Amino acid sequence: MSPAPVIIAIDGRSGAGKTTLAVELAARLRAHHRVSLFHLEDIYPGWNGLMVGIDRYVATVLEPLSRGDAATWTSWDWQNHYDGDSRVTLPAEIVIVEGVGAAAAAARRLLSAVIWADSPEEVRRTRALDRDGGTYEPYWDQWAAQEEEWLRTDDVPQHADVRVLNRADGSAPADVLQLLPYLPALAPALSPELSARRGLSIRTEQLDTRPDPAALFNSLYGTSANAVWLDSSNASQAGDQAGSEAAGRSRFSIMADDAGTHGQSMTHRSGQSELRAGCATATVARPFFRWLDTVWGNPAVSTPEGYPGEFTLGWLGCLGYELKRETGGSDHSAPTPDASLIFAGRAVVLDHAEGTAWLLALDAPDADEWLEGARAAVEAASGPAAPAAVAARAGGSNGVVLPEAPTFQSRDTAKQYREKIAAAQHEIAEGNTYEVCLTTTLSAKVPAATLDPWQAYLALRRRNPAPFASYLAFGGLTVASTSPERFLKIASDGGMRAEPIKGTRRRAADPHEDAQLRTDLAASLKDRAENIMIVDLLRNDLSHFAVPGSVTVSRLCAIESYATVHQMVSTIDAQLQRGSSRAEAVAACFPAGSMTGAPKISTMAILDRLEGGGRGLYSGAIGYFSLNGATDLAVAIRTLVIDAAGDGTAELTLGVGGAITADSVPEDEYEEIRTKAFGVLSTLGADFPDA
């Protein structure tokens, strides 16, 4: 008896390409494993024998193989229409079984993974008849009727771990193999396949030019369904402060999509992830941060020589606040995904300090073609006409992005928000918390045809440039952010940094008044107290995975000025302990303490009661998880989420909030959320809803 094998079933209707997929997948897996392959077509007892064949397959093939025994079974003689010879299928490290019914209900308890292959009916019929010729044609309808009868009571696609739209273009085996190592039941056996990605090399090109970032992104990724632009849109202002904290945060911009050989996308909702690679989609039931720990954190590539950035390709996107269910908070749902990420096997990185563009691509058959196209796009975006063309498409420097200003509604009226402030102060007085970061949500619906999310973002980045601005497109979901706040950075060498913002004043057009507002913020005892409480919280969060004694506060209650606000910012640094999980270190700090209050866990429970609804992406995080183990994440504030509902409308949501302490004045706190919303609302021509 051999050890119990990993058994992968490939199921689907006749003509879906199961046999070819199984053969190709087995060939690829044999690079690292012993693989046995079984075809159900060898065991069906005739053209009306689907159900009997499934029973025979489970009893005589799956049962013994699942125990690690050889399977002895009776084949079917299709020419003479009766039982044929006795055959043996030997156990192996991996067994692939394919055919209609391979993943039937009776079989699933013995399977490690289920792949469902599908194709349009006309493609399936043509493929099956081309393969089997005239022998099959008289029986097509009879066999198809059996399939439909079986599937009416056994919804195999619903139980599939991987679904593949087999287009017969040769892409299915590679796409499926990208996803199989993510399945928990297969991960141990397929560790060589996952490790193989860590041996990939990065090809780089440095171009000494300053392309217009918006023109370049639009040229390369304007038609991509899934694309990310981490946009240091205040780079020109920050560059005037060489060597400053602001200049360091604003040095690099990153843009990428999920196309190409290595491209993937991932969406997570309530403990379940959906991963896509080309024509294949996998469903993985696993907490997000546990999944992240399997795909990121162990350095998979080395930083290319001469390349100054920390991002060396990997995952980019956003994490929603409701992931707090995995870090000590309660379980709530949100209308938008809890996480949306792409895996970029190629990207453009702009170094604003040096005035260069870097092209990065994992080695792949399509790398040369992409590098050539990206090089041409960078050169075109460096021409004098590029910025003017983008500005014209956006309707001017501060152009209106909607024909009519949207009317926003608030989850809380002014009266309700002030009552919630009082309730938060009651919790503080009772000793249940020290600080409560109370938030609300503004929302509006507009005709989808009247709003171009790309133009909306261009207007936002001009109106309110920020070091952690970003534009994320995930199908019908768009994120347009002008965040000034870093949540957490972990460098490839393990250096950790958090830079919480607590304390906000509006900017004024009059220089004297503006300077006075900045001075008032710097001197505010209330704002300093709020900031210092969050600094203490983040010192604690970082300490869980930091080298003892390495946690330091290098900047306390400094004032930074942006286009529409002054902010109070602190900096906490630490060194990650060698061997610690980077994903767990991120989870230990999530969500950002500046968006919860302190102590974090009990305050999140208070917020759940007070706020009465999910926050979604707001107060989550936006950034990257790089193949060299680095991450840089911003807090998702000053962030407009645009969700195309599919009914011809688009819902706009904007979260705003502020820290409530015992000294808070309700009217001042309400004015603060108006100030924070102003940059986004004014760009849309909208007003704060004061009802």
Which residues fall in each region the model found?
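NTP-dependent small-molecule kinase module
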Residues: 1, 109, 113, 130, ...
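Extreme N-terminal, non-catalytic leader segments
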Residues: 1-8
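P-loop (Walker A) phosphate-binding loop of NTP-binding proteins
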Residues: 13
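Hydrophobic positions on the alpha1 helix immediately C-terminal to the Walker A/P-loop
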Residues: 21
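Extended alpha-helical targeting/anchoring segments
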Residues: 183-691
